[in-house]
Amino acid sequence: MQWSPTPGASACLGWASSLACSTAPTLLGRAGRGPLMAAKWFKEFPLNLKTVSERAKPGGGGGKLRKNSEAGGAGPGPGKGRKNSAAELGSGRAGVGPKDSRLSRDSLQGLIQAAAGKGRKNSRATEEEPHRGATKSSGCSTYINRLIKVDTQEKNGKSNYPSSSSSSSSSSSSASSSPSSLGPELDKGKIIKQQETVIILEDYADPYDAKRTKGQRDAERVGENDGYMEPYDAQQMITEIRRRGSKDPLVKALQLLDSPCEPADGGLKSETLAKRRSSKDLLGKPPQLYDTPYEPAEGGPRAEGKARPPDSRLPENDERPAAEYEQPWEWKKEQIVRALSVQFEGAERPSFREETVRQHHRQKSWTQKILKPALSDHSEGEKVDPGLPLEKQPWYHGAISRAEAESRLQPCKEAGYLVRNSESGNSRYSIALKTSQGCVHIIVAQTKDNKYTLNQTSAVFDSIPEVVHYYSNEKLPFKGAEHMTLLYPVHSKLH
């Protein structure tokens, strides 16, 4: 008996079928001689073939189909026809004895199963060539899809891909298309990162090669003051004055005093004055002396072509007593008045000085008011006429007490003097002198020949006017008054 190969079967299937069928009669003929050996060999033969087929394709669909055919289940078209023919063959030989029928049924069933398994494998290879991907095991396709999911989740965050039940062709196409779809998105991310610009918020964060923006250039205009010589509060005040400008006359006066002027068209421009101090409106308090550091103006042009002394603000030239350092505003009044008087220099300058002197003298005692006309009529270092009698000299006050002489010398300058009658019996006359430590009374001694001298080592004079005339040009020979001369005579109210 020889099996005819099916139309879809390959050459290998025909060879296997012919081999099995040609071997069957020989084995059946020898069944009488060694039935036990043949039965054992036929039982092991299909099992070996099954093991080889399952090892070649573990868990494949062919194994399941062979198992179904053994259990009597449905299978594919060619397998089903072969199974039915095998069943008919077995039923036709039912009349054989029990031993022979058992041998023939087992041997034929094993051969049919082996031939059917290989035939179905080859027929699937030829007939189902376009759908090869569908025959892949579910475990393998799940493994491929899992790899694709991990790749897409890490790179793109997308998980909407086909499940394990999808075909391998769609999974392979998605796997092949995923790198190409990820490519443009990665490129877009790189382009976005390249287009990002660094925003610099502060000037301290700038590297040395950073380009400055327009906002930074606007913030660093000329109006900003970043000097290190002045305190922070002074910088803020100066910046505010430069921006808004100040119409306060006191501030302009201080500008005249502190800043050099630039002459233009024969005059001064108030716009060119450097604003170094703030107004009282901005501060809420008067400007202080030490608001700005000492900056001497060297050779700078001043108003009316006069230069201010560069060391006028030095501490050693400060005329204030130690107790007045806490009251700078009162002391600065005279300085502000001098600053305001810069524009009035010329013919009005002498009258301004006289007014200052008169104002100073008004604040003194009533004795100064009495002596004020006498002081204004005589200049410093007035010459004495030695030929004029003593009674006609303006500095002779006659018989006045010691206390009265001191009171008359009190408002006078240092080295002021007067001559009076002495209260002591040793001399007739005495000279009252104003020194830095108070009033000194010098006794004029009279010799036996009616001449006058101050001490035993000094010169001798014939009259008191000659003594006064001599010591108005020479220094007095007394301890504590070696550097003094009789400079400022105090006129008597009788003359």
Curated annotation (Swiss-Prot):
Output the PROSITE patterns linked to this UniProt entry: SH2
Q: Which GO terms describe its molecular function?
A: phosphotyrosine residue binding
Question: Which InterPro entries does this UniProt record tie to the protein?
Answer: SH2, SH2_dom_sf, SH2_domain_adapters, SHE_SH2
Q: Which SUPFAM superfamilies match?
A: SH2 domain (SSF55550)
Q: Which residues carry this modification: Phosphoserine?
A: 107
Biased amino acid composition, Low complexity: 162-181
Keywords in alphabetical order, please.
Phosphoprotein, SH2 domain
- Which residues are in the SH2 domain? 395-490
Query: Where is region (Disordered) located?
Result: 51-190, 203-233, 256-327
Q: Where is the composition biased (Basic and acidic residues)?
A: 148-157, 208-224, 301-327
Q: Where is the composition biased (Polar residues)?
A: 135-144
What PANTHER family does UniProt report for this protein, alphabetically?
A: HEAVYWEIGHT, ISOFORM A, SH2 DOMAIN-CONTAINING ADAPTER PROTEIN E
Q: What is this protein called?
A: SH2 domain-containing adapter protein E
What organism does the UniProt record list as the source? Answer: Homo sapiens (Human)
Upper classification of the source organism reads: Eukaryota, Metazoa, Chordata, Craniata, Vertebrata
**UniProt gene name:** SHE
